[in-house]
Amino acid sequence: MKSKLKLHGFNNLTKTLSFNIYDICYAETPQDQQAYVEYINSVYDAERLTRILTDVVDIIGANILNIARQDYDPQGASVTILISEQPVTPTESQIEESPGPLPETILAHLDKSHITVHTYPEIHPVDGIATFRVDIDVSTCGVISPLKALNYLIHKFESDIVTVDYRVRGFTRDVEGKKHFIDHEINSIQNYLSEDTRNGYQMTDVNVYQENLFHTKMLLKQFELDNYLFGDATSNLSAEQREQVTAKVKHEMLEIFYGRNVAV
């Protein structure tokens, strides 16, 4: 087993894991399309997202400093959680009656680790294809690794397409003063995915090793049309219509996966 790196002072590396998670469905009528947006807004409201992110905090072994959350009109929600490595206990100055902190004291809190999530439901104006996007950032300072949250978040949002970016910034010093720009071995984000996740997705990497920048795109392999239908479309489609909708949904997924418009 490789011995731990002995550091001089605090581990100053910042590790950031960013997700763009997409869930696709087909809603045939305007009524169903509106119902889909309302469904997403209710299932993934700020309160539910807070519970999910709180689980992430537990998984990566961090402690919550502060939570800010908001539901938006007409759609979408966001949550931001400030976290730290160590448990936070109130100091005497926080408990006693005294003047509030100076601005520089408040800013000191803002450079702590954080987790954010934003949701973006949207619907194609003609084809009835509905896309639910979730953007998640897990940024940590010190020894806490955001990579521990990978599998949980991918499965929690029943992801059809996932774009994952991981980067390490800054440097830390060992006891001899030598700089270390990364403190763990990694050649692909896929190394940190569970076997069932790797087997379930088609994946491609674009990695810039010298910049400690890693990028993985994931597309769900198994396609069952019934998993992508919402409202009347679950029972009203003819065999021919099912073929057409299958083509539409797969085309949408490929465009998102490759990040460009693809000719039909």
UniProtKB/Swiss-Prot annotation:
<dbReference type="InterPro" id="IPR016067">
    <property type="entry name" value="S-AdoMet_deCO2ase_core"/>
</dbReference>
<dbReference type="GO" id="GO:0008295">
    <property type="term" value="P:spermidine biosynthetic process"/>
</dbReference>
<feature type="active site" description="Schiff-base intermediate with substrate; via pyruvic acid">
    <location>
        <position position="113"/>
    </location>
</feature>
<dbReference type="InterPro" id="IPR009165">
    <property type="entry name" value="S-AdoMet_deCO2ase_bac"/>
</dbReference>
<keyword id="KW-0210">Decarboxylase</keyword>
<dbReference type="GO" id="GO:0005829">
    <property type="term" value="C:cytosol"/>
</dbReference>
<keyword id="KW-0949">S-adenosyl-L-methionine</keyword>
<keyword id="KW-0745">Spermidine biosynthesis</keyword>
<comment type="function">
    <text>Catalyzes the decarboxylation of S-adenosylmethionine to S-adenosylmethioninamine (dcAdoMet), the propylamine donor required for the synthesis of the polyamines spermine and spermidine from the diamine putrescine.</text>
</comment>
<protein>
    <recommendedName>
        <fullName>S-adenosylmethionine decarboxylase proenzyme</fullName>
        <ecNumber>4.1.1.50</ecNumber>
    </recommendedName>
</protein>
<keyword id="KW-0620">Polyamine biosynthesis</keyword>
<feature type="active site" description="Proton acceptor; for processing activity">
    <location>
        <position position="118"/>
    </location>
</feature>
<dbReference type="Pfam" id="PF02675">
    <property type="entry name" value="AdoMet_dc"/>
</dbReference>
<dbReference type="InterPro" id="IPR003826">
    <property type="entry name" value="AdoMetDC_fam_prok"/>
</dbReference>
<dbReference type="GO" id="GO:0004014">
    <property type="term" value="F:adenosylmethionine decarboxylase activity"/>
</dbReference>
<feature type="modified residue" description="Pyruvic acid (Ser); by autocatalysis">
    <location>
        <position position="113"/>
    </location>
</feature>
<feature type="active site" description="Proton donor; for catalytic activity">
    <location>
        <position position="141"/>
    </location>
</feature>
<comment type="subunit">
    <text>Heterooctamer of four alpha and four beta chains arranged as a tetramer of alpha/beta heterodimers.</text>
</comment>
<keyword id="KW-0670">Pyruvate</keyword>
<comment type="similarity">
    <text>Belongs to the prokaryotic AdoMetDC family. Type 2 subfamily.</text>
</comment>
<comment type="pathway">
    <text>Amine and polyamine biosynthesis; S-adenosylmethioninamine biosynthesis; S-adenosylmethioninamine from S-adenosyl-L-methionine: step 1/1.</text>
</comment>
<feature type="site" description="Cleavage (non-hydrolytic); by autolysis">
    <location>
        <begin position="112"/>
        <end position="113"/>
    </location>
</feature>
<keyword id="KW-0456">Lyase</keyword>
<keyword id="KW-0704">Schiff base</keyword>
<keyword id="KW-0865">Zymogen</keyword>
<keyword id="KW-0068">Autocatalytic cleavage</keyword>
